[in-house]
Amino acid sequence: MIAIQLPDGSRREFDGPVTVAEVAASIGAGLAKAALAGRIGTGDAARLVDTSHRIEADEALSIITAKDAAGLDVIRHSTAHLLAYAVKELFPDAQVTIGPTIENGFFYDFSYKRPFTPDDLAAIEKKMGDLAAKDEPVVRSVMPRDEAVSYFKSIGEAYKAEIIESIPADQAVSLYAEGKFTDLCRGPHVPSTGKLKFFKLMKVAGAYWRGDHRNEMLQRIYGTAWATKDDLQKYLVMLEEAEKRDHRKLGRELDLFHIDEHAPGVVFWHPKGWTVWQQVEQYMRRVYRDNGYQEVKGPQILDKGLWEKTGHWDKYRDNMFTTESEKRDYALKPMNCPGHILIFKQGIKSYRDLPLRYGEFGQCHRNEPSGGLHGIMRVRGFTQDDGHIFCTEDQILPECDAFTTLLQKVYADFGFTEILYKVATRPEKRIGSDELWDKAEAALIASLRNSGCEFEISPGEGAFYGPKVEYTLKDALGRHWQCGTIQVDFSLPERLDAEYVAESGERLHPVMLHRAILGSLERFIGILIEEHAGALPFWLAPTQVSVLNITDGQADYARDVARSLQKQGLRVALDLRNEKITYKIREHSLQKVPYLIVVGDKERASGAVAVRARGNQDLGVMALEAFSQKLAAELAT
């Protein structure tokens, strides 16, 4: 007898070995039809298997359907294979390489003699639909490694053969076949192609084989797949909205910034964009000042010797911009922490000085691959609201407490109220005692509980030198942006000989808390632009008020109105052009200015202004003083 333990605690017994599909069928016809895979085992030992997997001994089993996150991943992985199947049917000379799942979808890389066209993409998607409609079984088999290499070479799949050759010779490999197509894969996969109904191919892009620019450029076809037609449609609508909000598009239309071929991955800020930058920076500077941070500034270029001590020279050198001068090697800093330790080390520090909080708008450079650059969201030169707290072990909890509370307020001020929290705990390879890790992890978890946060724990995902909390924003489109972090570091102060004098007179290494709220200011501003679709909150808008005259007869009055508002500290544009007022209103509305003031003869005669708010709201005519008070009140909230 074989006993199967189900998630609801019930047990089912079978006379002998049984497949996942057979267990599902024993529960009900509906579950048998919906089953996509199974999860056997519990805890860290649990693993996903095909519905054809035979269970030979007592086991815990969960049936995976499209309602489960794991089920959606199985659908997407299987759809990637369906894509490769369709490509091979239409373009037999194409070679398949790899096809993993990614967020919201999948991709597959192909080697082919010419670029795939939009018409090709449409034909491939249609072929995928035809193959899915045939509802062909997806069959798993196992083959010795060398035999698998020979098989793929025999059918002209050199890339697959190369992948398999990198697997140890004594390991067997699993293959999945659907119709005439066979692919290498760990699995699991859906039981038949008929389970794959709701998908769409999105685009074609270039990708180097194995991510190495010295290798052949392949063609990467991206797609998305979902459990239901409604889910697919919602996702496609979200993508349409995201395209309208694309910060690169809005950056051009609103004249905020540009990226130039002469400096790939570095931002050229235009006057309006730099105004937004300054508002963000000045806000964060007040945050530093009001929360006990001392602002510092370190050099951008530092000697190689420092990076050797920190370990970056060995592990991160390929991502650093380096130079040489007078037979000394230097690097542009990719991060600010070593510089802050050098500042901490100047002069003797006592336990009475701790916690010591440094903050910097630190400009960093990282040599990101050109293919990964994306507007101002993924750049090579960026500025961080980077802070480091030097403290004792007992101060970790109160500092983490204060930081989480502060971060929540900052995000709310920028319009973000949905935050996801994740605690990354100790990895297997780490430094520091278990007692110290216990204290640090407990402090991070307690700080989130004290703030009333729901959070998830990611076991083993902390750095070797300490655990961390990641703070992720959820935007108006439901997308996630990981921005903030607080990272406990037991290592770097010791590596760079940072010490303080304890109450006992003993010299100790401080604990270092790396913390950022916005992360990269460039990226955060990109997120803000997309979150607000370019219509930034009044306090952030590069132009807050535009003053428009109807005819030349009101030009002097319009100047007086603009001057009065500017004296109030507002950012005002004055448009005295000899154009129709409807044209001027439309042009400034497209620039997403929060308030437009129109002045004609009536307004001039009464000392009033006609006010239009963003979104085509007519607020009517009001006294200039009343309008000024309204804006002052809005800024005060």
Swiss-Prot record:
Cofactor remark from the record: Binds 1 zinc ion per subunit.
Domain (TGS): residue spans on this chain: 1-65
E.C. designation(s): 6.1.1.3
SMART domains: tRNA_SAD
Cofactors: Zn(2+)
CDD domains tied to this protein: TGS_ThrRS (cd01667), ThrRS_anticodon (cd00860), ThrRS_core (cd00771)
GO cellular component: cytosol
Keyword ATP-binding attributed: yes
Binding site for Zn(2+): 337, 388, 514
Reaction catalysed by this enzyme: tRNA(Thr) + L-threonine + ATP = L-threonyl-tRNA(Thr) + AMP + diphosphate + H(+)
Keyword field contains Glycosyltransferase: no
Family in the record: Belongs to the class-II aminoacyl-tRNA synthetase family.
Name of this protein: Threonine--tRNA ligase
Taxonomic source organism: Leptothrix cholodnii (strain ATCC 51168 / LMG 8142 / SP-6) (Leptothrix discophora (strain SP-6))
